[in-house]
């Protein structure tokens, strides 16, 4: 039987059995405090997330382009390498207002649209910074196989090295199918947005972030956004964001001012 030799000090025990050694690291005391640089200002370990506080993102994020929305998202933006779901009422298509600024700045690769309900208007998107040559529209046909085809196309797009972001319009989908997309987005570090009808908000989902968005009832120029799921406390009140892009608001304001000045000059010469 091989001899066993044990060497100990205050922090390390080494047990040698023949030519094999097992090194066991342990603390001098079970109540030893963690190093100061691992503690937050409140004395809580940085790896511990408190449910009443908005968590930081586990990875990189892309800013949404709206400071109010960034302040309500873990890490301050859309999570990169994670699934984000956006729910909307029937007939509402507010996804471009929410996603366009991030898509314009996320890189120079392709932005794949799987099953988009309408063909995007390239010049309008280009005016907001998303160049039309980056758009790749995957048309989805109807029928019983449509859902499976959209899922397949979404996963293949996530695996493509030349793709920066994928937007997929999905209807009925199972949690395990969404989890597969989530894993692909994480593996290849892509932005992934799944657009679904609002009735899907009651279904289980592995998404890291779930939002509901629709025009505000009292103002068509205001977009109401609610966080259905995020790593943090529930939102006390929904967000009310400007529905029109900031650049368009400036152009409309300038046009209104110019029109008013022109009318004043016309009246003065009358």
What do these predicted ranges mean?
Residues 98-102, 124, 153, 177-181, ...:
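A short acidic, amphipathic alpha-helical/loop segment
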Residues 2-113, 127, 230-233, 252-270:
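Detector for small/aliphatic-rich hydrophobic stretches
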Residues 123-125, 155, 178-180, 204-206, ...:
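Short, well-ordered secondary-structure micro-motifs
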Residues 194-261, 267:
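Phosphate-binding/switch region of NTP-binding enzymes
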Residues 76, 105-106, 129-130, 156-160, ...:
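Conserved catalytic network of the ASCE P-loop NTPase/AAA+ motor domain
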Residues 159-203, 214-216:
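A contiguous pocket-lining binding segment that forms or flanks enzyme active sites
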Residues 112-173:
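Long, charge-dense
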Residues 69, 86, 135, 166, ...:
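Conserved RecA-like P-loop NTPase ATPase core
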